[in-house]
């Protein structure tokens, strides 16, 4: 359930919107989230989704979901469907049906014809290499193409023939006629159409010319009545082109969109480049786009992150024009905080040590009811059985304890969570000297109460060996060992492969034992394993006969670079 407090507090974009509404410039807010369907959404997109949909929600406006699908070779319906699923999972609903920039191709073509008729666009025959040479540099003005002064009639004829498929791919382009001496390279006669014979996921084989993003995006905003077009700072230099196109096309749109930029999210210890994420998948460093170690929304969902936790993270990351570098601990902290409130509790033992309760009758089972959550009675209770043999965590016992150790030691006492106080009477070892079993006695008068006259400080979790559910647990950690794996240069000044910094211990699969309540859980069921961390039943691999739990986050931030 959304509420207005879940979104970023006052920031410069909210100030702009409030001024626009107060002045009457706009009667209502209309935003859009415009992903290209060429990959899976990641954490940076989650921030943008929360911003665009959140602003529409705060100001009782609308937010469109529009697919900017102008690159047919890279886009497909798999990505379209995944993006829609991710947006809905995050808790947002777009206005009307999803939009596609490709639905506007006819209008875009007509506007291009209008630009040609006005002498503001021309067909160019320069090759890509020649075009780069003519473009100039940041410090040197460009040169006019020798084809820049073609007549309107010739340009109309050539553009029509481009559309009709009379020329080879890449042989001609349509360029805007702006200023080759502009200090902004984006304004040096940018290409707005290219010839490309490629099947399009939405329009099929109707077109063999496709519009460029910078031309398409602003017109799509105008067609949809977008009031505030929000994008990251790398598009700041594209804003003059955005405005130029809208100022020069013959468009009767009532709303004049404006572009505003904010800093993109840079999350440490991961990468968000689609190309590099694809490399991880192709080279099988991960199991797929939804691998729980990936920063994709589908990966984070499979890891056990919640929509509420991601929205909280987006709020804490904030919106500004300054650099937005955020440590992974901020993301994990938001997820941890949300799960602390929402996740029911179970006990599970990851590294079991056998404990025999010598004065508990063999074959007997005793059950005690325990709350699923200490602060939410409505979550109910479960039965926690105890029998003569239990498992505890191996590191909850120390034969030679360090200073301050408050758990089980030879001759010492500890309380079993939701159970008795036990005392370690004997340590059993194998031939190699490894501890393989503890023989303990229980204090029968301590179930649900403290022993009179003595203080037992330690409390440990455990499971009944006879009743425990055997589960598969995947212990996930950060995918990279350094903050910026794609920004390290070698001695020669060249960037080192980001894969050099993959964390070899980013996942470890073990067999563990959990309370019997863990046996029949549905997929994507989130739990706190008491004293260990937060876990989720895997949305793909979990089943009644093969329970699989993924570690979402530990109870505390104890991560150290490897």
Swiss-Prot record:
Chain residues that bind ATP: 36-38, 42-48, 232, 264-265
Sections of the chain in a coiled coil: none
GO biological process: glutaminyl-tRNA aminoacylation; glutamyl-tRNA aminoacylation
Gene3D superfamilies tied to this protein: HUPs, Ribosomal Protein L25, Chain P
Residues involved in L-glutamine binding: 68, 213
E.C. number(s) listed in UniProt: 6.1.1.18
Cell compartments where the protein resides: Cytoplasm
UniProt short sequence motif 'KMSKS' region, positions renumbered to this chain: 271-275
Molecular function terms, GO-annotated: ATP binding; glutamine-tRNA ligase activity
Broadest EC class assigned to this enzyme: ligase
Catalytic activity: tRNA(Gln) + L-glutamine + ATP = L-glutaminyl-tRNA(Gln) + AMP + diphosphate
Motif interval(s): 'HIGH' region: 35-45
Keywords: Aminoacyl-tRNA synthetase, ATP-binding, Cytoplasm, Ligase, Nucleotide-binding, Protein biosynthesis
InterPro entries xrefs: Gln-tRNA-synth, Gln/Glu-tRNA_Ligase, Gln_tRNA_ligase_bac, Glu/Gln-tRNA-synth, Glu/Gln-tRNA-synth_Ib_cat-dom, Glu/Gln-tRNA-synth_Ib_codon-bd, Rbsml_bL25/Gln-tRNA_synth_N, Ribosomal_bL25/Gln-tRNA_synth
GO cellular component: cytosol
Stored HAMAP family: Gln_tRNA_synth
Similarity remark: Belongs to the class-I aminoacyl-tRNA synthetase family.
Subunit structure and binding partners: Monomer.
The name this protein goes by in its record: Glutamine--tRNA ligase
Encoding gene per record: glnS
